[in-house]
Every structure is written in structure tokens, then in C-alpha cells.
């Protein structure tokens, strides 16, 4: 992905750095409307996820995370923008007439062919079980449960690595640094997700972030005591606590937030590093 800088005519363009525009012309049979209700609220109307609301209307693109068109070659016809994710998507025309969207693998261009199955070549964009991949293969869109579809390493630029295979399990190093076990029968796609420079974008102005449905972020130290534990005081006062706290009074900055006694605790060999 190329980062595009505009000429410095206004502050918003001077500070902005956006990706080169990839047009979106989705197929009607692969999209449907979605009602994004709640805006960060639960069923009682209480804010449970902050800084969310507004944003432009979106049409959801049906993405093929299962890749269950087995042993049928497909051709990349378009590379399109998807408002629901940072990664690009590409439209695939299969030999049997089926048309589907998949995540765009890094380096794939229009006209390339892909295939999914058990005995397919180790080529960028191909999907196959982990048991058929050599060690050290870079992969994305990884299944956790057989047949459920890819759930891991789907963000822009995400890539995992197959580092070991033993018994019925394969050992993967995920983008977060976590090392965990997954069944060798689960499938994954070879290569890295495209749009690697998505984290280098700078929107340049507040309005661009509002289009994405992100509301302004307010520091707790400038709030009133009724709104945040850090609030109150005369002038620029410190937080008045031994350690930072969340708006609900729980310890912040360092406390582990993962739920205890999850079924996957025994599958994680090393915690994430970031």
C-alpha cells in the first residue's frame, strides 16, 4: 500500500497521510445492509465501550473465511476497499461460476489464481490444512475450530508463523507474540494479509475520525469526581491515587484483563508480548 501525502494547503491536508485510494464497486449478491445499533451501549443503554457513535453508513461484504471451494481454481478479478476492516478484499471468480470475496493477500495482483484443498502448492493465497504445510510457513486467516472458518490473523498486515507440529497439534506464533496450539487439521491461508501500511495512516483532522464512528477521547483527569476517579481538584491536580484507575475504579495500566479459567488456557504456551 502506498501512503499518499497531499500538498500543504490547509492544516488538515498538511497533517494527513492516507493510503492510495482503492475503489469499491461491490457485487449486489455479496453485500447486505447492517444496522449498527447501540453505539457502544448495552441493552440498558449504559455505555460499555467508550468513544463510539455516529459514522458513515456501511454495507457489509460477505467474506469467505471458510475457503470451502475445494480443488477449484479461482482468479482474482478485483481488489476493493472494505469499510468494515483495514485489510483490502479481492473478488474471486471460480471455475464453477462461484464468486466470492476473500481477504487480499499481500503481493497478490489481478489475474493471479488461487485454490484451496489438501494437496495444493504452498503458494500465496492458497488455503490448506496445517498438516500439509512445511515448518516456517507464513500464514493468515487461521481456523481455531475445524470447519468454522478463519478467526486468527485477519487484520491488515497480520501474519502468523507455523513453528512446530507434534501429535495432533500444531504450534503457531501469532502476530501478538502469543505462542499457542491448534489442531493440525485446521486450515489457514498462505502469506500475509495485504495493506501492510494501514498503521501508518494519519487522518489529519477530527472529522475524518468521526466518519469512522469514533468519538472524541476525554482524559479522566479533566473530568469531575462523579465521572472519573481521576477527576476533581483545583487546577491541574494529580490523580490523587497510588495507581491509575479505570472509570469504574478498577486498576488500570498493567492489570491482566483476560478472563480466568478459559478452556484455551492449556493451549497457550506463551502469553502475548504486546
UniProtKB/Swiss-Prot annotation:
InterPro entries from the UniProt entry: NA-bd_OB-fold, Rib_uL2_dom2, Ribosomal_uL2, Ribosomal_uL2_bac/org-type, Ribosomal_uL2_C, Ribosomal_uL2_CS, Ribosomal_uL2_dom3, Ribosomal_uL2_RNA-bd_dom
Keywords assigned by UniProt, alphabetized: Chloroplast, Plastid, Ribonucleoprotein, Ribosomal protein
Keyword ATP-binding: no
Compartment(s) where it occurs, according to its Swiss-Prot or TrEMBL record: Plastid, Chloroplast
GO process annotations (BP): translation
UniProt subunit comment: Part of the 50S ribosomal subunit.
Similarity annotation: Belongs to the universal ribosomal protein uL2 family.
Source domain of life: Eukaryota
Family annotation (Pfam families): Ribosomal_L2 (PF00181), Ribosomal_L2_C (PF03947)
Chain segments carrying region Disordered: 1-25, 223-274
One GO CC annotation: large ribosomal subunit
Signal sequence interval, chain numbering: none
GO function terms (MF aspect): rRNA binding; structural constituent of ribosome; transferase activity
Name of protein: Large ribosomal subunit protein uL2cz/uL2cy
Amino acid at each position: 500500500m502506498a501512503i499518499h501525502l497531499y500538498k500543504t494547503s490547509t492544516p488538515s491536508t498538511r497533517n494527513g497521510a492516507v493510503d492510495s485510494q482503492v475503489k469499491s464497486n461491490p457485487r449486489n449478491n455479496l453485500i447486505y445492509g447492517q444496522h449498527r445499533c447501540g453505539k457502544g451501549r448495552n441493552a440498558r443503554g449504559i455505555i460499555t465501550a467508550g468513544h463510539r457513535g455516529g459514522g458513515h453508513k456501511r454495507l457489509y461484504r460477505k467474506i469467505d473465511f471458510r475457503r470451502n471451494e475445494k480443488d477449484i481454481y479461482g482468479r482474482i478479478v478485483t481488489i476493493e476497499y472494505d469499510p468494515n476492516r483495514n485489510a483490502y478484499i479481492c473478488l474471486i471468480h471460480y471455475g464453477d461460476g462461484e464468486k466470492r470475496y476473500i481477504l487480499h493477500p499481500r503481493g497478490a495482483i489481478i489475474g493471479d489464481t488461487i485454490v484451496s484443498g489438501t494437496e495444493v502448492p504452498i503458494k500465496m493465497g492458497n488455503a490448506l490444512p496445517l498438516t500439509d504445510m512445511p515448518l516456517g510457513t507464513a500464514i493468515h486467516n487461521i481456523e481455531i475450530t475445524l470447519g468454522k472458518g478463519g478467526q486468527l490473523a485477519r487484520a491488515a498486515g497480520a501474519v502468523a508463523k507455523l513453528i512446530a507440529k507434534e501429535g495432533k497439534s500444531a504450534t503457531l506464533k501469532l502476530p501478538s507474540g502469543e505462542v499457542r496450539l491448534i489442531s493440525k487439521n485446521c486450515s489457514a491461508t498462505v502469506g500475509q494479509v495485504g495493506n501492510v501500511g494501514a498503521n501508518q495512516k494519519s487522518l489529519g483532522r477530527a472529522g475524518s475520525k468521526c466518519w469512522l464512528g469514533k468519538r472524541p477521547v476525554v482524559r479522566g483527569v479533566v473530568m469531575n469526581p462523579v465521572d472519573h476517579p481521576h477527576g476533581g481538584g483545583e487546577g491541574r491536580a494529580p490523580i490523587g491515587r497510588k495507581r491509575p484507575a479505570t472509570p469504574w475504579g478498577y486498576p488500570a495500566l498493567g492489570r491482566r484483563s483476560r478472563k480466568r479459567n478459559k478452556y484455551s488456557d492449556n493451549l497457550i504456551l506463551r502469553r502475548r508480548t504486546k
